[in-house]
Structures are given as structure tokens and as C-alpha cells.
A protein has these predicted regions:
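FAD-dinucleotide binding site
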Residues: 8-17, 24-594
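N-terminal secretory signal peptides that target proteins for export/translocation
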Residues: 1-6
Length: 594
């Protein structure tokens, strides 16, 4: 159950990609292929998934929770290393958030989830996709902008590009700023522990950073005396969070006034799936993007093909992982599966909802990471068209739109306190003619996506055919935007209304959102989430992977999911080799003593 909706192909974009063949990534992951075992994967059939009561037919080396990209890549690597695996998947299909719907009369495969391979030259999935026979199509990023419902002219586009460049440069410098703030916090902490008077420490901090910008520091220095631990934790977090708010780096020059809403939406909700003020600058700065390609049959189809032949128990939502003994027991309904290790690859959203109980409870730092990381939201409205309403635009074109809302949508937006431009306008993203087909895909991100999706709560439980009872506003806004963008006054005649499909990832019980988001000051929690957990005997038994655990350059993405699965597989194998060697050594010592 992995990878999310779609980080869009803007300058700091998102997708889900992975790592199998890329030497640039391989070089950074320790090679665990030495000392491979000769163990053969036990025979697998559906009976392995349907046994009632205590399941004891096989004790697998690894039970993998989730058949998304991370789980599948881990399973393939573990089998390659000679380890036996069983994958438990809550859904009736594999792929997680890599999932294709078939749109319009031509049944065009369009991804409900992530659609792009970002940073094609360095993306580890590029070669794998090509080798498996899929055809890539380049996305046109010289995007048209629509301001107040009209297409921006060349000069306005230049202004936007200039502002975007300034923002990206500033965010890149943010990582350095955060490190400076961390060093400042460590210095203050050291002095406090050395009994330097609090007033003196605070005076030094005030000289460097005005407390007006960091209210927590003001409270810390003027409130009750704290223990050294409290003082250090609060100071470090306050400084780190303040310098890591992505919205701080939006250029404020007057020449950018008209395009700032587009920039904020493009860098925030339409990319990170969260409002820019809730987004980590460091997380965004480190993400690697570049040239962006779609896949002819969809990434969902690619991931499904990648998982062919793997032992997967579908319709098996895991409810408990017990790692208290010599191995693990993983419960799915009334079935209990046994293994030496467990690899959990579910989304941050599933972990936050506590859908899986862990016995014993996870360490506090792991729980803190789960609590701190968030799930972003991205809704797609996929509209099949009867004809090409954008004859002057290239295929696979990415567009930004800002325009007035229909009356009923405006009333709703104000009631829900959703972000508006000048009190009446919304900002959306669009992909025009994906895969060179007469289709338009509208994107709502962040608060807009979450609020629109929640209108379908109790009516829908995932993505698919539009529901007129609850998707009406999403469709009305998209229809209005398409009319303004194309100049088609009779837009309804161009739309195949019965074929519209809508994504609702926040309502999907296998994800509870599009993809993970690191809020300001919490980018490092991804690394904590990825840490393995030891059982009572001191041996690592419980492992984690998925886009939420990815390195900063792949945060929340397909390559992050894929790489994390591969890395976890190698970590598991290395741990087992060490354990097996100790057992052999103990056996040798025992025979010698005899």
C-alpha cells in the first residue's frame, strides 16, 4: 500500500519511482548479495491466504505488509537474495496508490495515483520501464498560465518564471539556514547545561533572531524555568521550525504581486499536496526533479506488471504485528502468519490511524515520527472530451489556472474557509491531452482536495466513477475552468459527462491521503520512520519502508518507495546473515565442548 496521488511536474515535483537498476543509487546502498542462501521460496497458492485459525503451513523469512511499490520491490529483492516472502495486501489488487483507471470511449489508461517519472535522466525507474517495454512520453512544462480566467501573455509568463526561479533559489539556501539555526540551538543548549544565566543566553539569541518571529522563544525565555532537557528540545524545535517554513521564501517584490497566488499553489498544494505554510522548505529543496515523462499504459500498469508472480494474499488487511517472540506473527482477520521478520510498507496515513497494532508498542521516537509526519491530499477530476478543445496546446501539457468560482462553489469555499485569491478565485492545475488523448485532468491540492473529497465521506470509499451527489462541486469548478481556458462557451457539449472519474485518496482506507508531507521542522522524521525495531532479544525483527521513509531527494515519491523497499530487503538479509552466522558459531562451539 504505497505511493500516492501525484506530485505534479513543477520545478520541485513528485512522482513515484524506484531504484532497481540505477547505479547512481545502487552505489549508495550496501550490497548484501554476498553470502546468498540457497533457500527456495515455498510453493504458493490461494490456500496460503484462506486458511482459518492459526496459520502454520510455512514460516517465511519475511512477512511483507502492503503490495505497493515498496513492498513489491522488497519482495523481488529478497527472493533474489534467496529469502522466502509472503505479502499481505488489504486491497483486492496490487500496486497501492499506483493504480490505473480507464477513461472515455477509448478506455485510455490514466493513473489515479502518481503518473510521472520525474527527473528522467537520473530516475532509477527510467531504465526499468524501458526494459519492460513501456513507452514514455515527455510532459510539456513550458506551461500556459491563466490569471483571473485569461491566458497570461509572454511578459506575464516571464515574470512568473522569474519569481519561481527566485523562490527555488531561496528554498535551496533554506537547508543551510536550518543547519545554522540548529547550530545556534545546540550552542544555547550547551550554555544552559553549563549554568550560564538564562537571561544572558536569551539576550544572545535575541541579537541573532528577533523574538517577534519566534514566539516560542519569547515564552521560553520569559516563562517558567525549564529543565535542561525541556529548554534544549524547545529551543532546537523553535529555531528549526521557523527557518523551515517554505512560505517564508516566496519573493515579495511588487512586480510579482499578480502571480504570487499561482506560485504559492504551484509550490505548495499542487506539488507537496499541502499548503505552502505547512510544508518543509528543506524537504522541498532536496527533492530531485527535472524532465518528466508519462508512461503509455500508466505507472499503475507498470507496477502491476512488476509484481507479477509474487506471493500476495489479497483482501488481507493486517490488524496486528507481534514481534515479541523469536520471530513475528502477523494477523489478518482470523488468520495468523508466521515469519522471522516483518516489513511494514503501509502509508503514513494508515500508521497514523492506528489500523495496525504493534506488540510490543513501537518505540517512542517511532511513534513521534508517525505523529509528526502528515498525509497530503490531491484530487484529480479526469474529464474525457468529445473533441480537442485545446488545438493550440501540445500533448501532455501542464497548465496552471486561476479563475472565478461558480456561485455554489464560492459559497461552499467561504463556508469552509478554503484558500481564495481576492476572495473569489481558485488555483488549479491541469494536464491537457495526456497521452495525446482528448482528455483533461484537473487537480485540486491540499485543503481544497481534502475538503472536496470529504464531501463523499460515507458515499464513496476510493477513486472511480464520479458521484453526482458529492463530486458535483469538483466537477462544476473543473468544467468552469475548462470553459475559460479553452474559450468554449458550450463546454458541456464537449464533455463526456458520464465518463468523468474522480480520485478520493483521503477516503481510501489503504492510504488515507495522497502521499506523505513533512511539515516545517520535521523532514528528519522520515529517517526515524525508516529505522528498524529490535525485538526483546535484541535482534532487529520489524522493518519499515515506503515513500514516507524515503531519503530527502525522493521524499514522498515512487523512487523513494522503490529504493526504501530495496534498502529494507538488504537490511533484512544482512541481519539474517549475521544471526545465522552467530547460530553456526554457537553450534561449532557446542560441538567443540562436547
Amino acid at each position: 500500500v504505497i505511493s500516492p496521488n501525484t506530485r505534479l511536474p513543477s520545478a520541485i515535483a513528485l512522482c513515484f519511482a524506484g531504484i532497481l537498476l540505477a547505479t547512481s543509487i545502487h552505489a549508495q546502498i550496501p550490497d548484501a548479495h554476498q553470502g546468498e542462501t540457497t533457500f527456495t521460496q515455498p510453493p504458493f497458492d490461494d490456500a496460503d491466504c484462506t486458511s482459518n485459525g492459526q496459520y502454520r503451513a510455512h514460516r517465511y523469512d519475511v512477512i511483507i505488509v502492503g503490495a505497493g511499490l515498496a513492498g513489491l520491490s522488497a519482495a523481488k529483492e529478497l527472493q533474489h537474495l534467496g529469502r522466502s516472502v509472503l505479502i499481505l495486501e488489504a486491497n483486492n489488487r496490487i500496486g497501492g496508490r499506483a493504480y490505473v483507471g480507464f477513461i472515455g470511449d477509448n478506455k485510455v489508461p490514466i493513473d489515479y495515483g502518481g503518473a510521472w517519472i520525474h527527473g528522467v535522466p537520473t530516475n532509477p525507474l527510467t531504465g526499468l520501464v524501458d526494459s519492460m517495454g513501456f513507452i514514455r512520453q515527455r510532459t510539456e512544462l513550458n506551461l500556459p498560465y491563466f490569471i483571473n480566467g485569461r491566458q497570461a501573455g509572454n511578459e506575464e509568463k516571464k515574470v512568473f518564471d522569474h519569481a519561481l526561479e527566485e523562490y527555488e533559489d531561496a528554498v535551496t539556501l533554506a537547508a543551510r539556514s536550518v543547519e545554522n539555526q540548529r547550530a545556534l540551538a545546540e550552542h544555547a543548549c550547551s550554555e544552559y547545561k553549563s549554568h550560564v544565566p538564562r537571561k544572558e543566553i536569551c539576550r544572545d539569541l535575541q541579537r541573532r533572531i528577533p523574538f517577534s518571529k519566534i514566539s516560542v522563544l519569547s515564552d521560553l525565555c520569559q516563562g517558567p524555568v525549564r529543565s535542561p532537557g525541556q529548554f534544549c528540545r524547545t529551543t532546537e524545535k523553535a529555531l528549526r521550525v521557523t527557518s523551515d517554513v517554505a512560505e517564508r521564501y516566496v519573493p515579495q517584490s511588487g512586480e510579482f504581486k499578480d502571480i504570487i497566488p499561482l506560485l504559492i499553489a504551484n509550490a505548495g498544494p499542487l506539488e507537496s499536496a499541502a499548503e505552502l505554510r505547512k510544508t518543509s522548505a528543506v524537504d522541498g529543496a532536496h527533492f530531485e526533479a527535472g524532465e518528466d515523462d508519462l508512461i503509455d499504459k500508466g505507472i499503475g500498469t507498470f507496477v502491476e506488471k512488476l509484481g507479477e508472480g509474487l506471493p500476495v494474499c489479497r483482501n488481507s488487511p493486517v490488524t496486528e504485528v507481534n514481534y515479541s517472540g523469536d520471530g513475528v506473527k502477523v494477523s489478518a482477520g482470523d488468520k495468523v502468519f508466521e515469519g522471522a521478520n516483518a516489513l511494514v510498507t503501509v502509508s503514513v496515513g494508515v500508521l497514523k490511524k492506528k489500523k495496525i497494532a504493534f506488540r510490543p508498542e513501537l518505540p517512542k521516537r517511532k511513534l513521534q515520527a508517525i505523529d509528526t509526519l502528515q498525509m497530503g491530499n490531491m484530487q484529480k477530476v479526469i474529464v474525457p472530451l468529445n473533441r480537442d478543445i485545446f488545438p493550440n496546446e501540445p500533448k501532455n501539457a501542464w497548465a496552471l489556472y486561476e479563475g472565478d468560482l461558480p456561485a455554489e462553489a464560492l459559497t461552499f469555499a467561504k463556508k469552509q474557509h478554503l484558500p481564495l485569491v481576492n476572495g473569489t478565485r481558485v488555483v488549479m492545475g491541469f494536464v491537457i491531452k495526456p497521452l495525446n488523448q482528448n482528455i483533461a485532468i484537473g487537480f485540486f491540492g491540499g485543503d481544497w482536495a481534502r475538503t472536496l473529497e470529504q464531501r463523499c465521506d460515507n458515499l464513496e470509499h476510493g477513486s472511480g466513477k464520479s458521484n453526482p451527489k458529492c463530486d458535483d462541486l469538483s466537477i462544476a469548478i473543473t468544467r468552469s475552468a475548462l470553459s475559460n481556458m479553452s474559450g468554449e462557451k458550450e463546454i458541456d457539449e464537449a464533455i463526456q459527462a458520464d465518463g468523468i472519474q474522480v480520485t478520493r485518496w483521503s477516503l481510501d482506507a489503504t492510504s488515507f491521503g495522497a502521499y506523505s508531507v513533512a511539515e516545517p521542522g520535521s523532514w528528519h522524521e522520515r529517517e526515524v520512520l525508516a529505522e528498524p525495531v529490535k525485538g526483546p532479544n535484541g535482534i532487529k525483527r520489524l522493518f519499515f519502508a515506503g515513500e514516507g521513509t524515503a531519503r530527502e531527494i525522493y521524499n514522498g515519491s515512487y523512487p523513494g518507495a522503490y529504493e526504501s523497499g530495496l534498502k529494507a530487503a538488504r537490511d533484512i538479509h544482512a541481519t539474517m546473515l549475521e544471526t545465522e552466522e552467530k547460530a553456526r558459531e554457537a553450534g561449532r562451539l557446542g560441538s567443540t565442548e562436547k
